[in-house]
Regions:
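Extended, helix-rich architectural segments
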Residues: 1-276, 373, 377, 381-384
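Core catalytic machinery and nucleic-acid-binding channels of phosphodiester-processing enzymes
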Residues: 307, 311
Length: 439
């Protein structure tokens, strides 16, 4: 569970407000177990370091901070640093395809006796999704999927919703805030799962008054994006949601612990109600990964930015060379002999009708620096890189409603658009599979 606000904590309030968990005589989860969990969390975090670096880099590419991400930097601070938006344009078109095909639940009976249940679910599920503002969540997860290769849903039961009655809570989870066992491909195969979030210390102390004197800054750090704003986290601490599976002999039982540092805030194994059956009856981690392009050995994938950033880099570098050349040609410069006697200030000011000289002028005293235009073949190289980016991302012109010269028939244009949208259809099917798992 993402703990971005303490009002969203999903453990039963009455179970923890009046009982100090540390004093329970038969508790299975205490300080020792949480300290061991912290060590596992650190190992998981270390194993995910390269992935997190790539995710942060993709976010910078998305924000058009291209030049800070280039493999080789320009050393001349006066060089222009253009950032064309071919990569950005491709991503937003893919996202538009996702939102144009936003799914709706359609529950069908497996057999005749299921018809009544299927009909009831067909009426209930849309209401649950509407209460969760699921379209907004789908939108946000879609951006993550396209940019970084992985969008993550969290599907929880939040006891504080519906005025304390509780309800399903579907959230977007940040890749930097979730940790799993390195080397696994299916997230459900991980031995443990950690979801972390920074929360204000004073809010936690108010929420858990009986543990207020034990709550402090944990010292656990997580990777952060390069924010434009200054983000102060000095008065926040890391709240960890730890999920783990126990083999009961007939299947996996899922348990859940919420803790800060080595202080247990809630543990399902310490509750008689959940000891045998686990925190969720289905026994699965309450997360769903929507992956763009799969990789071996990880439940995460890579996205369109990873594919497009190389051609985008060379497009921008070629743009830099073209613009630099254009600036040199557009503003003539001159070689001037030290002793030619020309008033340089008057010469540089184009508003002066007259320029004073101290002696007679000769051709060798002042010479214009002649620039050489970039040959046409290098301009063509840039266009080839643009075409490469379009082709590799499946964002050809006709997918945006434009066509190349010679294609004018409506049926031909429609056929090109249909053929060109197959990568988007494949992408949407992946999102539909994640949607089905959520439901």
């Amino acid at each position: 569970m993402s703990v971005e606000n303490v009002d969203n904590l999903n453990e039963p309030i009455e179970d923890i407000n009046n009982v100090d968990i540390e004093e329970l005589p038969d508790k299975k989860i205490g300080t020792k177990e949480v300290q061991e969990a912290n060590e596992i969390l650190r190992k998981y975090k270390e194993g995910k370091k390269n992935l997190e670096s790539r995710v942060i880099s993709c976010e910078e590419w998305w924000k058009s901070n291209h030049w800070s991400q280039f493999k080789s930097q320009s050393n001349n601070i006066n060089d222009p640093k253009p950032t064309s938006s071919w990569l950005f344009n491709s991503v937003i078109n893919k996202h538009a395809d996702m939102m144009d095909n936003f799914p709706e639940p359609n529950v069908l009976p497996r057999e005749k006796s299921d018809e009544a249940v299927a009909e009831a679910l067909s009426e209930i599920l849309p209401v649950v999704l509407e209460n969760n503002d699921f379209e907004h969540t789908y939108n946000s997860v879609g951006w993550d999927k396209l940019k970084t290769g992985t969008g993550i849903y969290g599907v929880f039961f939040n006891t504080r919703l519906q005025k304390g009655l509780g309800d399903i809570d579907i959230k977007q989870l940040d890749m930097l805030n979730i940790f799993w066992e390195p080397g696994i491909t299916d997230i459900q195969a991980s031995r443990n799962l950690f979801i972390v979030e920074l929360v204000d210390i004073d809010l936690l102390k108010t929420r858990y008054e009986e543990l207020a004197d034990k709550i402090s800054n944990t010292g656990i750090d997580i990777s952060k994006y390069e924010y434009d704003d200054t983000v102060d986290t000095s008065n926040k601490t890391m709240v960890v949601d730890w999920y783990y599976k126990v083999n009961s002999g007939i299947g996996d039982v899922l348990h859940y612990v919420k803790y800060v540092g080595d202080v247990v805030l809630y543990a399902s194994e310490n509750e008689e109600e959940y000891t045998e059956k686990g925190y969720y009856d289905h026994g699965k981690y309450p997360v769903v990964f929507d992956v763009m392009f799969e990789e071996k050995g990880t439940p995460a994938g890579f996205g369109y930015i990873d594919i497009m950033k190389d051609p985008q880099e060379y497009i921008d570098k070629l743009d830099q060379a073209i613009l630099k050349n254009a600036l040199v040609l557009a503003k003539p410069r001159y070689f001037i002999h030290d002793n030619c006697g020309i008033n340089e200030e008057e010469f540089a000011n184009i508003d002066n009708d007259f320029v004073h000289v101290a002696s007679s002028l000769e051709d060798t005293h002042v010479q214009q620096i002649v620039g050489v235009p970039i040959p046409a073949q290098y301009l063509e190289v840039k266009q080839l890189k643009v075409d490469e980016l379009k082709e590799t991302s499946g964002n050809r012109d006709f997918s945006q409603g434009t066509t190349t010269a010679g294609v004018t028939a409506a049926s031909a244009i429609a056929a090109l658009q249909e053929a060109g949208s197959k990568t988007s259809r494949d992408m949407n099917k992946g999102s539909y599979r994640a949607y089905k798992t959520i439901l």
